[in-house]
UniProtKB/Swiss-Prot annotation:
NCBIfam families xrefs: met_pdase_II
Keywords attached to this entry: Aminopeptidase, Cytoplasm, Hydrolase, Metal-binding, Protease
Subcellular location: Cytoplasm
GO biological process: proteolysis
Record's function text: Cotranslationally removes the N-terminal methionine from nascent proteins. The N-terminal methionine is often cleaved when the second residue in the primary sequence is small and uncharged (Met-Ala-, Cys, Gly, Pro, Ser, Thr, or Val).
Naturally occurring in which organism (per UniProt): Fusarium vanettenii (strain ATCC MYA-4622 / CBS 123669 / FGSC 9596 / NRRL 45880 / 77-13-4)
Protein name: Methionine aminopeptidase 2-2
Annotated Basic and acidic residues bias: 1-10, 30-39
GO molecular function, one term: initiator methionyl aminopeptidase activity
Domain of life: Eukaryota
Primary enzyme class: hydrolase
CDD domains: MetAP2 (cd01088)
Binding-site residues, a divalent metal cation 1: D232, D243, E431
Length: 450
């Protein structure tokens, strides 16, 4: 989820490194059929007598006696324990707790720092703070588990999403998969703070570049063969958010656009300064006309803090003189956006989502009871995690628009608008979450796909 850069305030941040390379998931039914034994045949050991004259009578008596004496009881079917799942289903519904032993979730890709990298400080006190977090096994386990959920769900999305589907169905499919793999539907107060979506699933088509998700009251948008769709979603466990994005297209016309942005993201993970050069080395031919791929200038990568998708530091991927440092123990979302348009985004119509703001007036001072009630629901279910109106309706909230507007106007909620380039242009996005270590970076969200 990109951080928009204000035109009035230059971005803070600088680049920090990672690399390319790659997850997979398949599906097979869970459990096993219970076998049932049939009833035994009654009187199968009839009498056998040497007296031929009485053979028929004796035989009849023997059958009767046998049926009286040897009535076989029906055997109760043996209950077999369901086999532990070894593969992910499709759509993904097997919780990761059934596929992995806690503490043994896959690690990300490790990439050593370049010798020439000066972006990180070596101040002892800052390094000590970062190291304390890195040594916490629960912190690493939460992040790696969230990353594995992201990998498995996005693999399913890449295999199953096709033209003709609505964006609403695609978003619901991704989010249902995330919640199922986490084993938490998030419907009770407080559940959403334990684990869930890190922010609403972004599904941006063509010139729409960031921060669009289908919401109630909007007309269904159907994915077309000619569309270029950015898929950006986050997974959090105990407030530690994995933020990763990819772009899908079905028409090979746009292959170079996707390749340019993927290359730029991988270059930025290694050395931030190389992002712009990598992206601008590509061109895209659309309908007989050649377009240069331009980096989007007023949106940036960012650090991630506990329960906060945008932690305050920005990483522009164009040349700049900013000297903000990336520190050991910090988590960053390294993302790039490329476009055939102007390379500068504007606020589009509508609202993507909302985030609860700290500070501001007390909810008790709000003029509407509905706003006070809604503030309580948001705080209990999302905290500082970005949410959207679809999520409120999933919790059973009704007639909430006036309350939302009241919270926004009183500074208790921040609203995010969709961001777009000029109409008729096409844009792409790739993004990974990285963890900075003392001597290397761990690309937490790296998979076999990107």
């Amino acid at each position: 989820m990109g951080a928009k850069i204000s035109e009035d305030h230059p971005p803070q941040g600088n680049g920090g490194p990672l690399s390319n390379d790659p997850c997979s998931a398949g599906g097979e039914p869970r459990g096993a059929h219970l076998s049932r034994d049939g009833d035994g045949s009654v009187g199968d050991k009839g009498g056998d007598d040497d007296d031929d004259d009485d053979e028929g009578v004796v035989g009849a008596v023997s059958l009767t006696e046998a049926s009286d004496k040897k009535k076989k009881k029906k055997r109760k079917p043996k209950k077999k324990k369901a086999k532990k799942a070894t593969h992910q289903s499709s759509p993904p519904r097997v919780p990761l707790s059934e596929l992995f032993t806690p503490g043994q979730y896959p690690t990300g890709e490790f990439l050593e720092y370049e010798d020439t990298n000066t972006a990180r400080t070596t101040a002892a006190e800052l390094r000590a703070l970062g190291r304390k977090q890195l040594e916490d096994p629960a912190f690493l386990d939460d992040y790696r588990r969230a990353a594995e959920v992201h990998r498995q769900v996005r693999q399913w999305a890449q295999e199953s999403v096709k033209p003709g589907q609505t964006l609403r169905d695609i978003a619901n499919g991704i989010e249902d998969g995330v919640r199922a793999l986490l084993g938490n539907q998030g419907l009770e107060p407080g559940d959403g703070l334990k684990s869930g979506m890190g922010f609403p699933t972004g599904l941006c088509l063509n010139h729409e570049t960031a921060h669009y998700t289908p919401n109630p009251g909007q007309k269904d948008v159907v994915l077309q063969y000619e569309d270029v769709m950015k898929v950006d979603f986050g997974v959090h466990i105990n407030g530690w958010i994995v933020d990763s994005a990819f772009t899908m297209s079905f028409d090979p016309t746009y292959d170079n656009l996707l390749a340019a942005v993927k290359d730029a993201t991988n270059s930025g993970i290694k050395v931030n300064a190389a992002i712009q050069e990598a992206m601008e080395s590509y061109e895209v031919e659309i309908a007989g006309k050649t377009y240069p791929v331009k980096p989007v200038r007023n949106i940036s990568a960012h650090n991630i803090q506990h329960y906060r998708i945008h932690g305050g530091k920005s990483i522009p991927f164009i040349k700049n003189s900013d000297q903000t440092k990336m520190e050991e123990g910090e988590v960053f979302a390294i993302e790039t956006f490329g476009t055939t348009g102007r390379g500068r985004l504007y606020d589009d119509v509508g609202i993507y989502g909302y985030k609860l703001e700290n500070g501001g007036p007390s909810p008790a001072s709000l003029p509407f009871a509905s706003a006070k009630k809604l503030h309580k629901v948001i705080k209990e279910n999302f905290g500082n995690i970005v949410f959207c109106r679809r999520y409120l309706e999933r919790l059973g909230q009704e007639r909430y628009l006036a309350g939302l507007n009241c919270l926004v106007s009183n500074g208790l909620l921040e609203a995010y608008e969709p961001l777009a380039d000029v109409k008729g242009s096409y844009s792409a996005q790739f993004e990974h979450t990285i963890l900075l270590r003392e001597s290397s970076k761990e690309i937490l969200s790296r998979g076999s796909d990107y």
